[in-house]
Amino acid sequence: MTRILILGGTGEARALAAALADVPGVEAVSSLAGRVRDPRLPVGDVRIGGFGGADGLAECVRAHPVDAIVDATHPFAAQITRNAADAAHRRGIPLVVLRRPEWSPRPGEHWHGAADLADAAELLPDLGTRIFLTIGRQGVDAFADLQALWFLIRAIDPPDVAMPPHSTLLLARGPFAVADETALMREHRIDVLVTKNSGGGQTDAKLDAARALGIPVLMIRRPPLPPATETVDDVAGAIAWVGTLTRR
């Protein structure tokens, strides 16, 4: 039996868990960080909660042995990816990172790149005054000192950090339709969209809406992966990678 630890919390992680449940000789357990109050649970065994850093993750895979780790977390979950690489190296087990392809600007789109949240906050005052902030609830405090701007902040759960003084919080979970995103931006007179380059096989609805309305996008670039990290682009690639383990 090949035992796989899936570091999850994304749609790809749920799809991978469901697919591996039907593969003979493979047993997968999914781990969720527990940062969302009502997470969408994957098929199969699930653990919820952090590991306590790389040391805790290494101890977890020692106490509950696995043959490999698939990191299918969000592309911006940089710390857990570093921890996974560290723990896998210590335990001498293979790791693959499932990273969906990045988005790229299309004709008619107006993108401005930011290295991280702090860089985005510094660039934002020169781009507009009514901001649609779609980075999730973590990191909202990077914009808390921008008192001259107004923000529409969308997140699944309320932020537990400082928020910009002039802001409206919209609690909602996607996916969203292009027509709804367009109407939302028009209603709130949005003139800049701030988002992360989460990527995926299809363009996000908010990017399509911003393009249609001629609204510039401040796109936060992904953090780099640990050196020499093996990656796959999609669930099919992750399944094929697991298949190489079962044939060893």
UniProtKB/Swiss-Prot annotation:
One GO BP: cobalamin biosynthetic process
Coiled-coil segments: none
Top enzyme class: oxidoreductase
Pfam families: CbiJ (PF02571)
Superkingdom of source: Bacteria
Pathway(s) where this gene product acts: Cofactor biosynthesis; adenosylcobalamin biosynthesis; cob(II)yrinate a,c-diamide from precorrin-2 (aerobic route): step 6/10
Record keywords, A-Z: Cobalamin biosynthesis, NADP, Oxidoreductase
Family stated for the protein in its record: Belongs to the precorrin-6x reductase family.
Role according to the record: Catalyzes the reduction of the macrocycle of precorrin-6X into precorrin-6Y.
Protein name: Precorrin-6A reductase
Organism: Rhodococcus erythropolis
Upper classification of the organism: Bacteria, Bacillati, Actinomycetota, Actinomycetes, Mycobacteriales
Gene: cobK
